[in-house]
Amino acid sequence: MNIEQEREKLILFTKIGAIVLTSFALLATSFFVYPENRAVFNESLLHEKELPIYCVEKDKPQISISFDAAWGNDDTASLLATLKKHKVKATFFMTGGWIEKYPDDVKAIAAAGHDLGNHSENHKQMSQLSAEQCKEELLKPHEKVKALTGKEMILFRPPYGDYNDNLIRVCREINYYPIQ
């Protein structure tokens, strides 16, 4: 190879390198200029794992208060009074057994304007159930609350925080938002 060919090869290599570096720089810059693009690249997409809702972006800082109603109702009346006193709304995630034992509390929670959430029929490890069993665990308390209050529940918090892809798909299939 003569010097002219070496020079042309070096110029070509430099041009290709400049194009590659510029492309990477533009891509990296887009993550800072358009931060909403970062949400597209999350672990669930890389691993194709279904995830429940952990947080929601809002214009101003807010928190969400929720209670699991599964074992007793000793504190329900005082909770409702405290929430009313401070003009705060909350979500009550109820199991089917709790709904059956305390129907007046379910009605009081609904009448006070709080969100009614589903916490399954029997408080089972949902990741151990088939799709059909998951659906049954969700639909039974749903129907009980609807019969008592006329309200449709759309939020589901899995017992023990236990979920898998199967459960999340079932939730979405029956128009529930899985919450963690």
Regions found by a protein language model. Name each.
Residues P61, H86-T91, A111-D115, K151-I154, ...:
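Loop/turn elements at helix/coil->beta-strand transitions in domains of secreted/extracellular proteins
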Residues P35-R38, M94-T95, M126-A131:
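Acidic/histidine-rich helix-loop elements
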Residues D68, L83, F92, L116-H119, ...:
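Conserved, mostly hydrophobic/aromatic
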Residues L79-K87, I99-H119, C171-E173:
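Acidic (Asp/Glu)-rich catalytic clusters
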Residues S78, K124-Q180:
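Catalytic domains of cell-wall/extracellular-matrix polysaccharide-remodeling enzymes
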